[in-house]
């Protein structure tokens, strides 16, 4: 890792609040370089929140750069307000047409951030109930020429904001694991479509439960790694998913917790979010209850074993209330369920790599990791993140150009690089791509 990348990571920990002290390495920061990395990784707003917490003597950047950073942060704030409104309006439009929906990632993820308006927004990913045939048919009755792929169909933009209509939240390239993933989504979909929250003071939407997000967003990151590349923004999202998981179970076991403005269903106003002294909102959504439940026993080498010890020690040392003990048991049971799903889906080693990044890069305490960290896989994934940037747009290893042929050659080259670590996905990728070609022919308008 290069020197400025290391300084960037140190400062990122401070920005997200996993460390409280200003990193000493910041004295050697090249702020122009940090800004370039933040742009590459779509973390401009997150870092600017950290800059606002710094004493003036620690901000050694030129005034022009500071003003540019401030302007971009304000643009992100405005964009999030527009995205909030669009997510609400699009959800309501589908509801009136007879479809239940759930907003994936995006503005639902922003609810977990200390300052929801600092997250770099993208498009609207909306999961629409009904299955591929029904949803594709409905969308094309509105806009006949929209293109469909295996998990979503394009949709007319709403006030300039791109919309993707999902009939499957995500997918895996390995046919066997993907079959299990789609069964999981079918099994838990009811909780997702009925899990409604307030999006600031603008309106109400459905977002996934936190336990669902632990699995879904991991598959989303995995898919990006296999197909185009991932950035730190997706990993910061997952950091807050993990934080959110523990907040939910603590609040669920504590009925005295307020469900109003203190919860993650409340967006602070954009003006209040600019103070730089924001507190992470706590979610108060009821955790998902899997129909199948989790394993009744976890082996000693499983993360859940150490986690229960850590949670139990923490509980006995810091609290004597029944609610704290209940929170520990509830979160441990939920982790058992998540671990069982990750093993079934072939995601155990990848999850271990992500946990290594959560601990080493973001400063996540070991007691909050959902599987044991895997250094070998973590270092590989982290290198991919730093090389490729958000959506792989900055990957200098793309040597085949931007044509369709170049894209396919790049995919083969990527598969070769990934097969050592993720053989099932990498070896199935060419097969899936061939199968997907005929799937798209079937659903071509």
How should each PLM-predicted stretch be described?
Residues 1-122, 127-250, 308, 313, ...:
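Conserved NTP-donor binding/palm subdomain of two-metal-ion nucleotidyltransferases/polymerases, i.e.
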Residues 272-277, 323:
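Intrinsically disordered, low-complexity regions enriched in glycine and serine
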Residues 248, 257, 278, 298, ...:
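Short hydrophobic transmembrane-like helices used for membrane targeting/insertion
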């Amino acid at each position: 890792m290069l020197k400025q990348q290391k300084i960037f990571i140190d400062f990122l920990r401070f920005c997200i609040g996993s460390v409280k002290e200003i990193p000493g390495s910041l004295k050697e920061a090249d702020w122009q370089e940090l800004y370039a990395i933040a742009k590459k990784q779509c973390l401009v707003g997150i870092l600017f929140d950290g800059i606002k917490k710094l004493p003036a003597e620690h901000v050694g950047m030129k005034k022009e750069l500071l003003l540019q950073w401030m302007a971009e942060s304000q643009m992100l704030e405005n964009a999030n307000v527009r995205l909030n409104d669009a997510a609400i309006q699009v959800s309501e439009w589908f509801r009136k047409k007879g479809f239940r929906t759930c907003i994936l990632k995006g503005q639902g993820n922003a609810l977990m951030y200390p300052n929801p308006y600092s997250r770099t927004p993208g498009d609207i990913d909306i999961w629409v109930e009904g299955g591929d045939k029904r949803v594709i048919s409905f969308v094309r009755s509105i806009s006949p020429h929209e293109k469909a792929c295996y998990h979503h169909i394009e949709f007319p933009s709403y006030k300039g904001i791109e919309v993707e209509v999902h009939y499957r939240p995500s997918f895996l390239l390995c046919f066997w694991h993907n079959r299990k993933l789609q069964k999981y989504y079918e099994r838990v979909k009811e909780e997702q479509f009925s899990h409604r929250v307030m999006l600031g003071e603008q309106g109400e939407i459905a977002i996934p439960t936190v336990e669902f997000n632990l699995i879904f967003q991991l598959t989303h990151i995995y898919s990006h790694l296999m197909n185009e590349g991932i950035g730190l923004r997706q990993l910061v999202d997952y950091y807050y998913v993990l934080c959110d998981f523990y907040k939910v179970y603590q609040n669920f076991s504590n009925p005295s917790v307020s469900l109003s403005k203190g919860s993650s269903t409340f967006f602070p106003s954009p003006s209040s979010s600019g103070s730089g002294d924001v507190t992470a909102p706590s979610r108060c959504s009821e955790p998902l209850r899997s129909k199948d439940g989790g394993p009744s026993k976890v082996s000693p080498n499983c993360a859940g074993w150490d986690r229960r010890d850590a949670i139990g020690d923490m509980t006995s040392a810091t609290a004597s209330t029944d609610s704290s003990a209940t929170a520990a048991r509830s979160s441990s049971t939920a982790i058992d369920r998540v671990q069982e799903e990750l093993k079934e889906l072939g995601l155990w080693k990848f999850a271990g790599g992500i946990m290594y990044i959560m601990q080493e890069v973001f400063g996540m305490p070991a007691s909050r990791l959902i599987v044991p960290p895997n250094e070998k896989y973590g270092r590989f994934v982290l290198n991919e993140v730093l090389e490729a940037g958000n959506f792989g747009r900055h990957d200098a290893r793309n040597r085949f150009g931007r044509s369709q042929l170049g894209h396919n050659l790049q995919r083969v080259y990527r598969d070769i690089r990934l097969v050592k670590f993720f053989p099932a996905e990498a070896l199935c990728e060419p097969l899936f791509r061939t199968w997907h070609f005929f799937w798209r022919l079937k659903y071509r308008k």
